[in-house]
């Protein structure tokens, strides 16, 4: 629930997921039975993960997935989704968590885990300022939407409040 005096403008969302090399036989059929296979994977000492840096939203997601498990590679942290995808593509790691667009850019397999939403909360007292009006207008401009879609962001069409 929002506090009084602010307004929510829905922004964009992007899908985060489990990434892996599609030609790695250890991940065959992985997308069909993720939960079951993920448990098996955590007990395989041969599989190396690449983690995200502490404090990132992706790290929060990973820590929630892993619980108390610390698989091989847990201590190796990457600072971006691109770095995670590069590590997996170059076989420095077998799996990680990243956004769909970077997995596709590297030709990696992707199993969706959850969407992240990016919204804007603006004080009502600033709604009429030219910069705020410009931002609100940009949210629905077709060229902006198309460019952001190329980067893996989808316009969040939920209700503004």
Task: For every predicted segment, state its role.
Residues 21-26, 50-58, 125-127:
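Short coil/turn segments
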Residues 12-15, 106-137, 139-160:
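Periplasmic-binding protein-like
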Residues 1, 85-114:
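A ligand-binding cleft/hinge motif common to bilobed small-molecule-binding domains
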Residues 36-60:
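Short loop->beta-strand "edge-of-pocket" segments that line small-molecule binding or catalytic clefts
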Residues 69-83:
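Short beta-strand-to-loop elements that line the ligand-binding cleft
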Residues 1-33:
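N-terminal segment of the mature folded domain
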């Amino acid at each position: 629930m929002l506090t009084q005096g602010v307004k929510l403008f829905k922004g964009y969302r992007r899908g985060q997921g489990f990434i892996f090399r599609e030609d790695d036989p250890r991940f065959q059929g992985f997308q069909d039975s993720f939960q079951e296979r993920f448990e098996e994977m955590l007990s395989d000492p041969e599989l190396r993960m690449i983690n995200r840096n502490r404090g990132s939203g992706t790290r929060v997601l990973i820590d929630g997935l892993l619980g108390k498990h610390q698989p091989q590679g847990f201590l190796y942290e990457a600072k971006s989704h691109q770095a995670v995808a590069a590590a997996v593509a170059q076989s420095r790691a077998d799996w990680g968590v990243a956004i769909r667009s970077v997995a596709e850019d590297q030709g990696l397999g992707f199993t969706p885990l959850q969407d992240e939403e990016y919204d804007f909360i603006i004080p009502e007292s600033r709604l009429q300022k030219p910069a705020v009006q410009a931002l609100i207008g940009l949210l629905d401009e077709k060229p902006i939407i198309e460019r952001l879609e190329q980067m893996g962001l989808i316009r969040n069409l939920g209700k503004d409040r």
